[in-house]
A protein has these predicted regions:
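C-terminal motif of bacterial Sec signal peptides marking the signal peptidase cleavage site
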Residues: 60-62
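Sec-dependent signal peptide recognition
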Residues: 47-53
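Short, Lys/Arg-enriched N-terminal segments with co-localized hydrophobic residues
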Residues: 32-45
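Acidic, polar-rich low-complexity tracts and alpha-helical solenoid repeat scaffolds
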Residues: 69-347
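Bacterial signal peptide processing site
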Residues: 64-66
Length: 347
């Protein structure tokens, strides 16, 4: 039957089948069979489309729980931080405050990039300092007698009482450790374990910077050098190598430069109780050997230039020429750390 568009309308599959059956077997034509076949193909295609739509919907549904879970976790973390910060605002005990600050810092660092963690970590150090000071002040009587509690009357080390062990355990749980200051004095500081926990989550360039800072802490005690001359030279070399390994971080150069200059001066003139000369004013053999090694191992180093000139001096009884030599190189060298120092007014 012609349609309005001039095309022949296809009968439905059922109608086509009825027509085909109504004809004598000799008259059941190919056209009717073709129409029936086309409709069956059409139905099969529609079923396939519906199947694909169903599977797509199922896949989308399966993705939603993960997204929802992530959103829920983020909201829960934010809620926990808010709750902890409210508790912090009401806490007065420095130990409680330090514990809360650690929990807040841990939660904040979970949801940000390594670069953003640097700011969070440094903020923690700043705000934790006050509470560490508060704990030291509160426990001053105990800390003043810390070593006394661990020695007998003859000065021999003994096992501390269980109550003292429990007290030290509480310090450990807070992220604190006892640090010897010399001459029997001690104080509580943030523990190395705590630093390791946070530093491991930061970018490599910051981790290296941090280790340089820690390694140059307390390199002198009671006027004595706590490192060997070679260890001191190695620390200087590591500072200088940092600028080559991480050239794109001049902001770190600005942080390292002052300490680096102090190391150079220490390397050349020694300390009150770790001198570079013997009683007669002659350069100590171990110092001369170390300077020679450094100049050969790091020929392009500004420190190598200093020691090369220092080795030419005839006398070391007066340290002023050495100090002037160090100052001269520091004012003229193009090494990034010394350039950074001059930019800050260091020279």
């Amino acid at each position: 039957m012609p349609s309005r568009l001039g095309h022949t309308q296809r009968p439905s599959p059922i109608v086509a089948l009825s027509l085909w059956l109504s004809f004598p077997s000799s008259c059941r034509g190919i056209e009717v069979l073709t129409s029936l076949s086309d409709h069956l193909v059409h139905i099969h295609a529609m079923r396939r489309i519906l199947y694909l739509l169903f599977m797509g919907t199922a896949l989308l549904s399966s993705c939603r729980p993960s997204s929802t879970k992530q959103t829920t976790e983020t909201e829960a973390s934010t809620s926990n931080i808010d709750s902890l910060e409210r508790a912090l605002s009401q806490a007065s005990d420095p130990a409680v405050r330090l514990s809360l600050k650690r929990q807040i810092t841990d939660l904040k660092m979970q949801a940000v990039t390594p670069e953003e963690r640097i700011r969070i970590f440094e903020d923690f150090l700043t705000i934790a300092e006050e509470d560490v000071y508060g704990i030291n002040k509160r426990d001053q009587d105990y800390l003043d007698r810390y070593n006394e509690y661990r020695m007998d009357e003859e000065g021999n080390r003994i096992e501390p009482h269980d109550s003292l062990k429990r007290r030290d355990q509480r310090y450990t749980e807070l992220g604190l450790e006892v640090e010897e200051l010399g001459e029997g004095a001690v104080e509580l500081v943030l523990s190395q374990a705590l630093f390791t926990h946070y530093i491991s989550q930061l970018p490599p360039y910051y981790q290296t910077y941090w280790h340089l800072l820690k390694d140059r802490e307390y390199i002198t005690t009671d006027g004595c050098l706590t490192l060997t001359w070679h260890e001191l030279g190695d620390l200087i070399a590591r500072h200088e190598a940092y600028t080559k390994t991480y050239p794109d971080h001049p902001e770190i150069f600005a942080r390292l430069c002052d300490g680096y200059q102090d190391l150079q001066l220490l390397y050349l003139v020694g300390t009150d109780n770790t001198e570079i000369t013997d009683d007669k004013g002659a350069l100590l053999p171990e110092v001369r050997k170390e300077w020679q090694f450094y100049a050969e191992a790091h020929p392009e180093s500004p420190t190598a230039k200093i020691v090369q000139e220092a080795l030419k001096l005839k006398s070391y009884t007066n340290l002023r020429p050495l100090r002037e030599l160090v100052s001269k190189i520091q004012k003229t060298s193009d090494h990034p750390l010394l350039v950074a120092a001059r930019a800050q007014g260091g020279n």
